[in-house]
Amino acid sequence: MKVLVINCGSSSLKYQVIDSETEHVLAKGLCERIGIDGVLTYQPAGQDKIKYEAAMPAHRQAVELVLKQLTNPENGILKSIDEIDAVGHRMVHGGEKFACSTLLTDDVLKTVESCNDLAPLHNPPTLVGVAACRELLPTTPMVGVFDTAFHQTMPPEAYIYGLPYEYYEKYAVRRYGFHGTSHKY
C-alpha cells in the first residue's frame, strides 16, 4: 500500500510516499517558499535530489506540483496518482477533540477548523492541503494524524496551567503537548 504523507506548514509542504508494507520511503521532498518564489525538491529513494523553481502561489498549487512530480514519466515513482492508496496529513492542532488518528470527513474538518485560533499558522494551510488532496484524489481515504492526540492522556494536573481556570474554560488554554507524532510513530 502506497501512502502519501503530507505536512503543510505556513509556507512549506513536506511530503513522502511510503510503502506501508515494507515501511520503505519511496520518495520524499519539500515545497518551500509557498506564496513567493517557490522551490520544489524531489528525491526518489536511492537517487539524487532534484530541485527546481516553480510557481506556488498557495498550498493548492504545491499539492498539484507534488502529484505531477510523483507521476513524472522521467523520474516519478508512480505511473498514475491512482496508485496512492491513502493520504496521511499531519494535523498540528485538534484541541481536545481528537485522541487518535482520524478519517478526515467533512464533520472532522469543520471541527479542526474550529481549532484554527489555537494554531493560526498551521491549521489553515493544512486544511487547504487537505481540500486540495480531497479534490485531486477524490476516492482516496484521507487520515489526520494530530500532534495533540498523543498527549490526550495527560491528567488535568499536568495540563492545566497555573492561570485562572476560566482561561481554560473560555479559551482552551492548557498544555497540549505538541509533536506527539514524533513520540508515537
Give the predicted meaning of each segment.
Residues S12-M56:
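Short glycine-rich, Thr/Ser-proximal phosphate-binding strand/loop in the N-terminal lobe
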Residues N123, L127, R134-Y185:
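ATP-dependent carbohydrate kinase catalytic cores
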